[in-house]
């Protein structure tokens, strides 16, 4: 009997013919399944490369692996690790790790980078994605040749001047050519070039601007290919830093580091092609210490401000505002932190920024690693200003204030005090244009932190008029607040007394017009109140060392736009430079600290005037007492030197004029002899008329003419007849 499979008999054959090739891809057939397939990029995001682990042999590899696993499992118990073996069976000093997700891997990088495994081993952690971006070493790399030391001479030669004269540099046009010159300030005389004429003054010395280093050791110039530092008595080239199209430069406080910035030539909104626009160099060696991406630091392709990095006084730390984060709609939120870097490793301190919500600005103390910050207010959160101790990150003192529209901070040079100015509104309204209008008036306050007091005391000073400017006496206990408006600005001098809860008003000086800035002399005691970019151009010179501040002089420099004290506080300069008000006579004027004019120079297209800074010198208490004890003798010596110099200058002028007159007499005698020799010839040419004959005195006629210079009406005395009538 034969079995028949009826189903098979009726079923159609769907088999592919021999040699058939299917052209339908899996992406079309099962896209929902392939979407879940892991990619290499996702895997790399979860992997972290760690270098710096101990190099051990095969006998100790197992123990090392168990210790490393304990360290890593503190961050994530699900971590997987692999130690690449060496040919001998030991390890190579590197570790490969895989984490649960990208967030865990990023946290591991921040936590393990710089982690001290023991006293001899410190980890360096990088994600696999970052490792792929590293360029391979060049096949043609060779060991750099040892460079000879470039000796430019004594960098502080100018400090050895017997009269302690200050120097300054100016940038202006000379015969139509941009020129930079370094001059020595000669009290009572015109400034002299500080060196040979061909070395101390040069045409096209810089392509944009020049800058002194903080201690005055170097003069820096900007060029298309980079930065050049000049030093020594001959202003020789000391260092060169290659940075194409560099725009801005800045020094660290002790001249150890130089920061340069060049805007990226090509970049998109994601910051591509821009990885080293911000660079930090070692000034002494010329080594590039660190390069930053502007986009990674700020979230933008351009810097928001300059200088961008703020340095601590000892250069151990430098900081900038953290890049703003974005919400789900890619909108920028307010900045909520400070990125603090260590200059020893040029890495972010503890691998993460310091979180401070809505932070607007910050400044380092001039004498300690204390950081002052200001966080702006929102509708729900008040503004906060306070002090942060680094590296402990302890908040020494803070205060919160509602409805703050504007704020500024002012450190005292001694670092003992910090002043915060705040403008506080009652109510605000938003206009259709988006502008903010403050309704109900504003109040103005100055809050002062006393850093040297226990628990950092805080005092408040309400101001009766709008705030304009503020400045501290650098070493004393006084400060000046400029209040009012452009029509009437009043400088007020206050003093902080011991055990007082508020500053005491010492003097309220005469009000002036268009005053907009106050400047204490670097050594304190004297104060300058400036009316910059005004038609009057007044400057008040005020002595604040007395029990009551006293104005000593008022000077005028119409339309000046810059004013500077010299580093010693002996001289003050006012300048009218390019970029100021149109119509101003460009040039500078130098005054004594009391306001007596010493020098006036008009220059074509004056662009810059900068005093040469002096390095800080700390004298012992014994030396200070010795100087105070001999102050009268020293002052008498300087007065005699000034008098001798004036006499010497007068004698030099007289001698110079005598030489000029003698040379003129020689030329006149020679021309007179030539004139007498050709007199007969001239008479014959004039038909016998001697037009050069001297006139006889008898031919002159004396005539007197009386001219009334002025007239006035007076009542004539009455006669006897008029009196009788």
UniProtKB/Swiss-Prot annotation:
Stated name of the protein: Eukaryotic translation initiation factor 3 subunit B
Primary residence: cytoplasm
Subunit structure: Component of the eukaryotic translation initiation factor 3 (eIF-3) complex.
Organism: Caenorhabditis elegans
Pfam families (UniProt xref): eIF2A
Positions of the RRM domain: 46-130
Keyword Repeat: yes
UniProt-annotated location(s): Cytoplasm
Cytoplasm keyword on record: yes
Swiss-Prot/TrEMBL GO biological process terms: formation of cytoplasmic translation initiation complex; regulation of translational initiation; translational initiation
Annotated keywords: Cytoplasm, Initiation factor, Protein biosynthesis, Repeat, RNA-binding, WD repeat
GO cellular component: eukaryotic 43S preinitiation complex; eukaryotic 48S preinitiation complex; eukaryotic translation initiation factor 3 complex
Domain of life: Eukaryota
WD repeat boundaries on the chain: 202-240, 242-280, 354-395, 462-504, 510-552, 554-594
Function: RNA-binding component of the eukaryotic translation initiation factor 3 (eIF-3) complex, which is involved in protein synthesis of a specialized repertoire of mRNAs and, together with other initiation factors, stimulates binding of mRNA and methionyl-tRNAi to the 40S ribosome. The eIF-3 complex specifically targets and initiates translation of a subset of mRNAs involved in cell proliferation.
HAMAP family on file: eIF3b
Phenotype reported upon loss of the gene: Extended lifespan in adults.
Family affiliation: Belongs to the eIF-3 subunit B family.
Annotated GO MF terms: RNA binding; translation initiation factor activity; translation initiation factor binding
């Amino acid at each position: 009997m034969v079995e028949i499979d009826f189903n098979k008999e009726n079923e159609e054959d769907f088999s592919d013919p021999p040699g058939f090739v299917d052209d339908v891809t899996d992406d079309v057939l099962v896209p929902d399944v392939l979407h879940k397939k892991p990619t290499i990029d996702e895997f790399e995001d979860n992997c972290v490369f760690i270098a710096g682990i101990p190099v051990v042999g095969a006998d100790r590899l197992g123990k090392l692996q168990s210790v490393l696993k304990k360290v890593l499992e503190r961050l994530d118990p699900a971590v997987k690790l692999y130690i690449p073996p060496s040919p001998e069976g030991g390890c190579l000093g590197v570790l490969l790790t895989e984490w649960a997700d990208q967030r865990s891997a990023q946290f591991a990088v921040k936590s393990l980078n710089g982690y001290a495994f023991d006293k001899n081993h410190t980890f360096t952690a990088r994600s696999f994605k970052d490792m792929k971006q590293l360029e391979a070493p060049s096949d043609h790399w060779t060991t750099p040749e040892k460079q000879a030391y470039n000796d430019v001479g004594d960098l502080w030669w100018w400090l050895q001047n017997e009269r302690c004269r200050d120097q300054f540099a100016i940038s202006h046009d000379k015969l139509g050519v941009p020129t930079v010159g370094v001059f020595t300030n000669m009290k009572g005389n015109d400034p002299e070039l500080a060196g040979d004429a061909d070395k101390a003054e040069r045409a096209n010395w810089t392509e944009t601007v020049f800058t002194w280093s903080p201690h005055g050791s170097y003069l820096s110039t900007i060029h298309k290919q980079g930065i050049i530092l000049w030093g020594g008595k001959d202003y020789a080239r000391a260092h060169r830093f290659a940075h194409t199209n560099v725009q801005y430069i800045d020094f660290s406080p002790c001249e150890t580091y130089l920061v340069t910035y060049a805007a990226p030539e090509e970049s998109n909104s994601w910051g591509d092609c821009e990885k080293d626009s911000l660079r930090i160099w070692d000034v002494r060696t010329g080594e590039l210490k660190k390069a930053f991406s502007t986009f990674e630091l700020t979230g933008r392709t351009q810097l928001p401000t300059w200088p961008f990095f703020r340095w601590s006084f000892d250069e151990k730390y430098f900081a900038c505002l953290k890049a703003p984060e974005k919400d789900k709609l890619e909108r920028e939120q307010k900045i909520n932190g400070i990125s603090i870097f260590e200059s020893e490793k040029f890495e972010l301190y503890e691998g993460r920024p310091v979180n401070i919500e809505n932070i607007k600005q910050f400044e380092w103390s001039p004498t300690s690693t204390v950081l002052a910050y200001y966080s702006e207010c929102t509708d729900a959160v008040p503004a906060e200003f306070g002090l942060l101790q680094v590296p402990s990150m302890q908040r020494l003192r803070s205060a919160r204030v509602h409805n703050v529209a504007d704020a500024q901070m002012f450190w005292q040079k001694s670092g003992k005090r910090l002043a915060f100015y705040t403008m506080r509104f009652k109510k605000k309204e938003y206009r259709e244009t988006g502008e903010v209008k403050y309704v109900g008036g504003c109040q103005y306050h100055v809050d002062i932190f006393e850093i040297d007091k226990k628990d950092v005391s805080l005092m408040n000073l309400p101001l009766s008029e709008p705030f304009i400017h503020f400045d501290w006496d650098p070493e004393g206990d006084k400060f000046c607040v400029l209040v009012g408006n452009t029509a009437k600005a009043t400088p007020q001098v206050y003093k902080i007394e011991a055990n007082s809860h508020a500053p005491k008003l010492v003097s309220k000086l005469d009000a002036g017009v268009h005053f907009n800035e106050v400047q204490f002399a670097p050594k304190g005691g004297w104060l300058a109140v400036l009316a910059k970019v005004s038609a009057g151009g007044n400057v008040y010179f005020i002595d604040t060392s007395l029990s009551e501040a006293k104005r000593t002089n008022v000077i005028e420099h119409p339309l000046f736009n810059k004013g500077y004290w010299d580093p010693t506080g002996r001289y003050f300069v006012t300048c009218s430079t390019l970029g100021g008000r149109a119509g101003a006579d460009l040039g500078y004027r130098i005054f004594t600290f009391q306001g007596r004019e010493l020098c006036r120079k008009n220059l074509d297209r004056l662009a810059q005037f900068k005093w040469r800074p002096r390095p800080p010198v700390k004298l012992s208490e014994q030396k200070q007492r010795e100087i105070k004890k001999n102050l009268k003798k020293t002052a008498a010596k300087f007065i005699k030197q000034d008098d001798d110099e004036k006499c010497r200058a007068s004698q030099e002028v007289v001698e110079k004029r005598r030489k000029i007159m003698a040379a003129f007499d020689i030329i006149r005698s020679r021309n007179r002899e030539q004139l007498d020799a050709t007199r007969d010839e001239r008479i014959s040419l004039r038909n016998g008329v001697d037009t050069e004959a001297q006139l006889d005195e008898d031919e002159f006629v004396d005539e007197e003419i009386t001219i009334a210079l002025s007239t006035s009406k007076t009542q004539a005395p009455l006669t006897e007849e008029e009196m009788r009538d």
